[in-house]
């Protein structure tokens, strides 16, 4: 495969208050064909998560801030289109921080190949992904519910319940 054109959503400016459309830009970038030990992934689903708002600000945190002019990063599910990496085959479904773009060239580090089973793919970015596991861990590890107690889960309280 030769060079491929990929659309991506980039951070154009740092939001003040609520993010607005003019803080982002849709751009195209040319990606080279994957070289030795690399693979080309087509994004199928991308997640929008609460932590991303903090990364739009230029400040020290547990994750580095998004860079102006660069694609946003977030949990994504994609399909391997082409592979020169022994760990992945064309057609594999992968989960990782692929970025907000149509296509992504990777060396495979940080990607997890998985079989979705009976769940829809997008569930692995929500209820079966980071937010669902955060809620589950919070309930069991922090809340430590005991027999006889009542647990109230409100969908209105955000992605983790």
Residue ranges of model-derived segments:
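Short glycine/threonine/proline-enriched tight-turn/helix- or strand-capping micro-motif at secondary-structure
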Residues: 18-30, 60
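Short polar catalytic/cofactor-binding loops
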Residues: 11-17, 46-48
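Residues that mark the start of a beta-strand
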Residues: 7, 38-40, 150
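NAD(P)H dinucleotide-binding glycine-rich loop of Rossmann-like/cofactor-binding domains
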Residues: 74-79, 87-155
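Terminal peptide-recognition signature
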Residues: 8, 43, 135
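Glycine-rich beta-strand-centered segment in the early N-terminal region that forms part
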Residues: 31-48, 57-100
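Short structural boundary motif marking the start of a folded domain
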Residues: 2-9
């Amino acid at each position: 495969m030769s060079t491929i054109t990929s659309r991506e959503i980039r951070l154009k400016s740092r939001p003040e208050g609520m993010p607005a459309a003019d803080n982002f830009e849709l751009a195209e970038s040319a990606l080279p064909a994957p070289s030795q030990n690399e693979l080309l992934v087509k994004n199928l689903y991308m997640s929008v998560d609460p932590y991303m708002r903090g990364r739009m600000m230029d400040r020290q945190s547990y994750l580095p801030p998004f860079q102006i002019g660069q694609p946003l990063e977030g949990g994504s599910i994609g399909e391997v289109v082409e592979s020169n990496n022994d760990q992945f085959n064309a057609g594999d479904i992968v989960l990782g921080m692929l970025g907000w773009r149509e296509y992504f060239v990777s060396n495979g580090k940080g990607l997890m190949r998985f079989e979705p089973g009976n769940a829809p793919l997008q569930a692995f970015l929500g209820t079966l992904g980071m937010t669902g596991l955060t809620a589950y861990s919070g309930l069991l590890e922090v809340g430590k519910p005991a027999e006889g107690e009542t647990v109230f889960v409100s969908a209105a309280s955000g992605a983790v319940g």
